[in-house]
Amino acid sequence: GCNLRCSYCDTAYSLSLTDTAEALTEEELLSRIHAFPWKKITLTGGEPMLHPVRHLCEVLGKEGYEVNIETNGAVALFQERPQGTFYTMDFKCGGSGMKERMLEENFRLLGKEDVLKFVVSSKADMDEMKTIIAAHFHKGEDPAFYVSPVWGRIAPADLVEYVRRERLSDVRVPVQLHKIIWDPQKRGV
């Protein structure tokens, strides 16, 4: 499940997965992971940091896996991260209704191997993103910065124009391709 209730949540079904989730022990999960040839794992959710994932990350890191933890920014990151672990961390701006839940102390734990992602729903959110980057990050070991529009609230072209106009050369604008290929409400893609 997820510990946030963002105004624009596009995966509300993940808030509580009691009817569809399959509970696995760490050993069962490792067995399933080992059945595949890939060495890159993403822990996502809901919110994976609500669960005891540190040991799993340690085991996978020692086995040569890269583990990407997609986290919502409202749960403390590991003070010392396991080998091979990196973060894609959201920062929920004001338009989400969850800004007060964000842990800005997580910023100091992000490095150049990580991603700080903003999902914006208004110009005010875009301005907030710009302010946060300027206040907390100073070139060098900074994470990559991604910004995506809330589907249906901001046109991607307007977001790209904002990034260009404000000269945010470190900010990338990835496209949620699954929302273009399939119906934006389709689950499991």
What are these regions (language model features)?
Residues 1-2, 53, 166-169:
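Short, charged helix-to-loop "capping" segments that act as catalytic/coupling loops
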Residues 1-4, 186:
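Disulfide-bonded cysteine motifs in exported proteins
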Residues 35, 123-189:
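Auxiliary Fe-S-binding modules of radical SAM enzymes
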Residues 17, 117, 147:
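Conserved short-loop catalytic and cofactor-binding motifs
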Residues 53-134, 139-143:
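Radical SAM/AdoMet-radical enzyme domain recognition
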Residues 3-85:
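Conserved Radical SAM active-site core
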Residues 46-48, 72-74, 92-94, 119-121, ...:
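Active-site beta-loop-alpha junctions enriched in small/polar residues
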